[in-house]
Curated annotation (Swiss-Prot):
Signal peptide: none annotated. One of its GO terms (biological process) is negative regulation of DNA-templated transcription. The lineage of its organism: Bacteria, Pseudomonadati, Pseudomonadota, Betaproteobacteria, Nitrosomonadales. Residues 49-139 form the ATP-cone domain. Its cofactor is Zn(2+). A zinc finger (unnamed) spans 3-34. This is Transcriptional repressor NrdR. GO terms for molecular function: ATP binding; DNA binding; zinc ion binding. Keywords: ATP-binding, DNA-binding, Metal-binding, Nucleotide-binding, Repressor, Transcription, Transcription regulation, Zinc, Zinc-finger. It comes from Nitrosomonas europaea (strain ATCC 19718 / CIP 103999 / KCTC 2705 / NBRC 14298). The gene is nrdR. Negatively regulates transcription of bacterial ribonucleotide reductase nrd genes and operons by binding to NrdR-boxes. PROSITE patterns: ATP_CONE. Belongs to the NrdR family. Binds 1 zinc ion. It comes from the Bacteria.
Length: 159
């Protein structure tokens, strides 16, 4: 690795430690030329699949949109941040673990609905109203009946 101080190509690793989360490695390096020390961090480069939108366009996966979707649905709901983060992490793991290069926005939306269903039924209904483009009160009533008639500990809605 190039030294940030003198630009020399030759540096050596003095110490390596895994972070508390285990997601990155901290390395202390020393330049062979100027002998100054510096720290680098090594992380895994995650390649998410491209998202195929309903209109057929392909876009890069944007995790901020995922966070925003959860934040809007859960606005002023009594759901701990840790539970929300865990739900988002499960979706990210599904995306990474899918092994596909492209995935439909519909699939991601269904995963979000499943997670929201487990977290908070009101948030689930909020998200469903936008995601499924509710047009009248009857659409809301149908989803509310679905939520009320399903088992309390169910894994989620039937799609």
């Amino acid at each position: 690795m190039r030294c940030p101080f003198c630009g020399a190509e030759d540096t050596s690793v003095v110490d390596s430690r895994i972070s508390e989360e285990g997601a990155r490695i901290r390395r202390r390096r020393r330049c062979v030329e100027c002998e100054k020390r510096f720290t680098t961090y090594e992380t895994v480069e995650l390649r998410f699949p491209q998202v195929i939108k309903q209109d057929g366009n392909r876009v890069e996966f944007n995790r901020e949109k995922l966070y925003t979707s959860f934040a809007r649905a859960l606005h002023k709901r009594p759901v701990p941040t840790g539970q929300v983060d865990a739900a988002i992490e499960r979706i990210l793991q599904k995306l990474l673990g899918s092994g596909v290069q492209e995935i439909s926005s519909r699939t991601i939306g269904e995963w979000v609905m499943q997670e929201l269903y487990s977290l908070d039924k009101v948030a689930y209904i909020r998200f469903a109203s936008v995601y499924r483009s509710f047009e009248d009160v009857g659409d809301f009533q149908e989803v509310i009946r679905e939520v009320q008639s399903s088992p309390q500990n169910g894994d989620g809605p039937s799609s």
